[in-house]
């Protein structure tokens, strides 16, 4: 039945039968189709006729309102997720093991390159409604399909080992990265080797690097774990041969190797010679070599191991030949991730001599107070050997000193070492081939030209050839396997002369003199050149700087420091020269400036806590710094 007052659909009334009076107009007769050219011509938009009862809008060219719903995508995916849960419009069923997972192809393909390739290429799966997957965990797949709809997933210890390979297969890189981030947070000595192997298996390069770095940095603890004991030979060899191993002493590497061998001694004893070649036996003390290594039956019964032991003992017995005897086994290890830390030791200011010390970390641009020495020392010589800092001689306000102490950055403590044979202040100190050299200085009565050498492995001082000139306020640096004693004061004049010590022949020879006379200057080596900065020429404090090239055999001037300095110290670090503290002719300084050889310019660096003249400075490569509970100071660089 038709509704009242309406015409039947599809029918029209002829004009002659239409009712008189007002009423709707009859529709216009159909028009013939326009010619092809006219149809192709773009039509001009006409203003829409106002509807009955509708508001009239102004026609403004280019005026419109853009709408952007920030929740549209979220709401759409929430709706699709609900549809999936109810099985609405699902066009694919994933079969894995005994599990069936319903989904929408378009959602999976839009999130996963793996599914995109499966459903859009000419693969048989693109036309199927049921697909079976292999080599993927059912629960992990279910979680990842749910993630495709919700963009949410929880990674934890219960699912990470199945979720990461599944995310890798489906190329869901965000989930894969989340798994790697979780594993990174779980690194511990007990599991880092396992995580490293897992990362390697699944080609997680960043996680692999981080886990490997963790193994190197925590090797002492890692070597005590079950995971280490179960490592194959190849991986043990790679670890113990690494230059980047973080060990307080080579004894830790030796003990780790023996523990691994003894875990399955019958199978592994054959590998002892190969393993011992990776242990840096020359860096062990002579007492340890004779008391432990030579006494170990696993080592003693292998001829190759006996040769390695003889090599190590020869390194100890002929210290002056260490430059010639050097091999990969005599090179100290440098911990992965370690950074340079500059130590300022002792020194003095007006009416005070300091025993306190501070250290500057370039990574944070901060100074930290570290443990004080047991003795106050100004005019002290400081150098680093291995992973320890040595403060040699100096002046305590009453007498010139022969005592020596060393700083352990791991424990943040100073320990006494064997004293020198001679009291020395204003001396030059440098390290070469694991030995500590002390030259010249003042013994309380006269300037000295004598020199001596300290071997930390044996704890003995040995006299070496004397310099040709008595030198007080001298500085010493090492370059190309030789020592250079630069300038100083001989009790009558300030010196421009320089002499070189060659350990192999135990002799000093003169080299080209500096352009200026200098005592109390700063001396350091950077990029194969010997630099001397500031000092005193007998009339004034200097800011001039010069550089010596062994190839040219001559000195040349470079940019002067911004401040006149003497009794300061100079050290190379991170490709820069740092001039630390000193005296400007009227007062002690806590300021520091650094030199860039690439731009030939000096710029200000962060100041120390304390003003220090006659200070000793050296650099250690450290992983964990600062020590616990050490005060810090961040001082902005100031205009010099």
From Swiss-Prot:
PROSITE patterns: BTB. Residues 1-50 are annotated as: Disordered. The keyword Repeat applies. One of its GO terms (molecular function) is ubiquitin-like ligase-substrate adaptor activity. It is found in: Postsynaptic density; Synapse. Residues 638-640 are annotated as: Interaction with PDZK1. Signal peptide: none annotated. Residues 21-35 have a biased composition (Pro residues). Residues 90-157 form the BTB domain. Brain specific. Broadly expressed in neurons of most regions of the brain. This is Kelch-like protein 17. It comes from Rattus norvegicus (Rat).
